[in-house]
Amino acid sequence: MSVTLVSAVDPFPTDAGKKVVLAGFLEYFRDRLGPQDVHYLLVGGQPQSEFPVTLHPLPRPSRKAALTAVARRVPTGRATLQESLLYSPEVQRAVQMTLERIGPDLEIYDTIRMAQYADEAHADRQLCYLDDLFSERYTAMLDAADRYPDVTIRPLGNFAEHVPRRLRPLADSKLPQRALLRMEATLARRSEDRAALRFRRNLLVNDGEAARLAARVANRGSADVIAVPPLVKPPQYRQRQYGGAPDFVFLGLLSLPHNEDGVRSFLTDVWPTVLTRMPRARLRIIGRDCSPELAEVAERFGGSVTREGYVDDLTEVLSSAAGLINHLRFGSGIKLKVIEALGRGLPVISTSVGADGFATGREHGVLVADHATQFAEAMAELTDPGRNREMSDSARGQFETTYARDAVFACYDKAFALR
């Protein structure tokens, strides 16, 4: 048996959530089938000597082709901006020629962006990995902008590399940004619904989103939509030796809009309340691509907040912290940083948005707080070594049950029907 994955994302290095999921798929298929029968079609990719499976670099759409696709497809409602920017007839031919040469038994397309290249003649062997629902992501951004006047939204995130440089400022200016988000949410919903009905099976990482997508199309036909957990690199686990210091961690790629807004709003809205309650509290912000605006906010709090950039080995940091801060005001999917914390037995304090998709409560190692006073109280609770130890065990238990390698592989066996 052979399998192909078609994507415009290089999974390595695994420095973003989407990359972690794709790398996990490759690890699973490599384990089950062997590297010679796992093929990765990478649109816009380059040859690599160390890639773990068989890599097939494909051309990316030229700027002219991408803009032509936008002009022809977006106004008619045929495709989203992101689909159009990644479409060209040349890439279509390259994908189909490569698939014909391989003759795979299973084809997996990475989100609606690559689903447009699937040949319906082979629908019985095709799956679509939808990641999270883009339509809900953009709607959540708009809702957050309405609820929080201070919110700063950068909707392009990691997709910016596929957008012509001259067009990128439009996505960061408020008036065109809101219009673009509304349009993209509507178009993405159409494409997601189309994928749900078109593919043999559709995969998401969030149970709630999977159920909502299935319900959206229930009156139009049969759709197989399921949630699968991401396979994360097993975190180096050692028994935590927490001693009671009020040290907390925010972890995440700061170029992602929900992370940047989350840590900035935490600093402005919650951190002063925390410092009033715990004057010795300390927040360590770990993650690449901190904007100058966020850096300026962090510097207002002096030594109580440190920006540490990318940290390769998180063992020491997370084993001694009181908890992980996951203060998100918008977002979709499931947050890999929470899984990382659970795997290390680190309790999590999260907004309800950030905890979506996880089991919550003290018995699961995840506390939910949506207001500054609630957050401060939850953080203070975790500075009690005994309570922290109990929640640490609960966090580790949730990881072992749902996100450990054996549990994820068993889920993938069913999702991909290999066992």
Describe these PLM feature segments:
Residues K337-E340, P347-T351:
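Short hydrophobic beta-strand element within catalytic cores of glycosyltransferases
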Residues G365-T373, A380-G386:
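Conserved acidic donor-binding segment of nucleotide-sugar-dependent glycosyltransferases
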Residues R200, S319-G333, L346:
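Acidic donor-binding loop of glycosyltransferase active sites
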Residues M1-P57, T276:
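N-terminal subdomain of nucleotide-sugar transferases
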Residues L86, G386-F416:
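A charged, aromatic-enriched C-terminal amphipathic alpha-helix characteristic of glycosyltransferases
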Residues V21, K174-R182, T186-R189, R194-L197, ...:
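Conserved catalytic-core segment of nucleotide-activated headgroup transferases in glycan assembly
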Residues L67-Q116, H162-F199:
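Conserved nucleotide-sugar donor-binding subdomain of glycosyltransferases
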Residues H122-S173:
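Active-site proximal beta-strand in glycosyltransferases
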